[in-house]
């Protein structure tokens, strides 16, 4: 979840050489997981079979929410999505989001965000180039915080796109391979979703996941 406020839910200047673009291996959408943490803080609707979801939230959001669609078991395969996302003045992310079981880790590939860049307050790991843009990469450690196994200590990994966008293909493997140089397990995946998260301000998102 967010780096600076109280963690909630189950659910970062060295430079790295660009990662060569691999051949994209797309998954069939095959969506089988709905992420709905505190979706009641806004208007969350979804169509799992169509791979679409929407979230609208207003000023006065009292806590953190994470909503989206994806898969019960994550992977390094590419994800293609399109979205309409408006979060100006809101602390919010549009991101590929998920967890690794061991070593336990929470991760984000942030495609667009509102008024808060998580790498502004975390430990920099450098940059990685993927899908037409440089991504800032950073990490943080969460100590005795809620997680997929209850209360635990785990690592967060973030890749934050500099040239933000709201549609495209995310070559997940590029990020996983870079993070793996810094302790990311790159296996034993828990769920993985295309998600919207926010914890302040107002905004809206409509997202379609095609692969």
From Swiss-Prot:
Instruction: Report the pH sensitivity of activity.
Output: Optimum pH is 3.0.
Please give the chief subcellular localization of this protein: secreted
Q: Which domain of life is it from?
A: Eukaryota
Q: Where is the GH11 domain?
A: 28-210
An annotated GO cellular component of this protein is: extracellular region
Which catalytic residues are annotated?
106 (nucleophile), 197 (proton donor)
Its annotated compartments are:
Secreted
EC number, UniProt record: 3.2.1.8
**One BP term from GO:** xylan catabolic process
Q: Which residues form the signal peptide?
A: 1-27
Which residues pair up as cystines? Answer: 119-138
Q: Which UniProt keywords apply?
A: Carbohydrate metabolism, Disulfide bond, Glycosidase, Hydrolase, Polysaccharide degradation, Secreted, Signal, Xylan degradation
Give the reaction(s) catalysed.
Answer: Endohydrolysis of (1->4)-beta-D-xylosidic linkages in xylans
**Entry GO MF terms:** endo-1,4-beta-xylanase activity
Mind telling me which InterPro entries this protein's record contains? ConA-like_dom_sf, GH11/12, GH11_AS_1, GH11_AS_2, GH11_dom, Glyco_hydro_11
Q: In which pathway does this enzyme or protein participate?
A: Glycan degradation; xylan degradation
Record carries keyword Signal: yes
Describe the task this protein carries out. Endo-1,4-beta-xylanase involved in the hydrolysis of xylan, a major structural heterogeneous polysaccharide found in plant biomass representing the second most abundant polysaccharide in the biosphere, after cellulose.
Family that this chain belongs to: Belongs to the glycosyl hydrolase 11 (cellulase G) family.
Give the protein name, as stated in the record: Endo-1,4-beta-xylanase A
Species of the source: Aspergillus niger
Q: What is the lineage of its organism?
A: Eukaryota, Fungi, Dikarya, Ascomycota, Pezizomycotina
């Amino acid at each position: 979840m967010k780096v600076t406020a109280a963690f909630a839910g189950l659910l970062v200047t060295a430079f790295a050489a660009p990662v060569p673009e691999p051949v994209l291996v797309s998954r069939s959408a095959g969506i089988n997981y709905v992420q709905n943490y505190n979706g009641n803080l806004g208007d969350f609707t979804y169509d799992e079979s169509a791979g679409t979801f929407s979230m609208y939230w207003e000023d006065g959001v009292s806590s953190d929410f994470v909503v989206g669609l994806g898969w019960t078991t994550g992977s390094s395969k590419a994800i293609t999505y399109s979205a309409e996302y408006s979060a100006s003045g809101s602390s919010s992310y549009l991101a590929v989001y998920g967890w690794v079981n061991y070593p336990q880790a929470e991760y984000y590939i942030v495609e667009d965000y509102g008024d808060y860049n998580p790498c502004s307050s975390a430990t920099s790991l450098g940059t990685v180039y993927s899908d037409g843009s440089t991504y800032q990469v950073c990490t943080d450690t969460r100590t005795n915080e809620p997680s997929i196994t209850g209360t635990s200590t785990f690592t967060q990994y973030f890749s934050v796109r500099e040239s933000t966008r709201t549609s495209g293909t995310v070559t997940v493997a590029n990020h996983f391979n870079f993070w793996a140089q810094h302790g990311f397990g790159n296996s034993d995946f828990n769920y993985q979703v295309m998600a919207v998260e926010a914890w302040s301000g107002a905004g809206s998102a409509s997202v379609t996941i095609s692969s």
